[in-house]
């Protein structure tokens, strides 16, 4: 595992951070696929850079593999419903919990720019 190359504690630490940060408390459900999350790494610049670089390299490789595997998959109506439900969960998280969104809205930021990441369609059940 790439994280272990840098520290035996990184995967466990950043997986927990991901699970905790991206949890929808009002629904009692996790978001995402359970990978890692971190921000504001300020331990050692060179080591932090090497770790972030390796995360990017691994992500790029894995993303290409996923796309290659799924690129020819035909979408069904059921798939679109699932996608829009997940988009709805993203909207909930972004507006209720995301630190960046909250900060931008509370400090008079450009609302259109802040909300630009919201999906064009979403569903709630």
Features from the language model and the residues they span:
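A domain-level signal for the structural core that forms small-molecule/cofactor-binding pockets
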Residues: 1-125
């Amino acid at each position: 595992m790439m994280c272990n190359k840098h520290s035996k504690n990184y995967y466990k630490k950043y997986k927990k951070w991901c699970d905790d940060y991206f949890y929808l408390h009002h629904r009692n459900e996790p978001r995402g696929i359970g990978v890692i999350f971190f921000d504001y790494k300020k331990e050692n610049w060179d080591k932090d850079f090497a770790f972030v670089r390796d995360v990017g390299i691994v992500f790029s490789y894995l993303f290409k593999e996923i796309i290659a595997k799924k690129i020819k998959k035909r979408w069904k109506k059921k798939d679109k419903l699932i996608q829009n439900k997940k988009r709805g969960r993203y909207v909930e998280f972004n507006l209720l919990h995301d630190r960046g969104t909250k900060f931008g809205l509370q400090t008079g930021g450009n609302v259109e720019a802040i909300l630009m990441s919201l999906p064009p369609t979403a569903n709630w059940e």
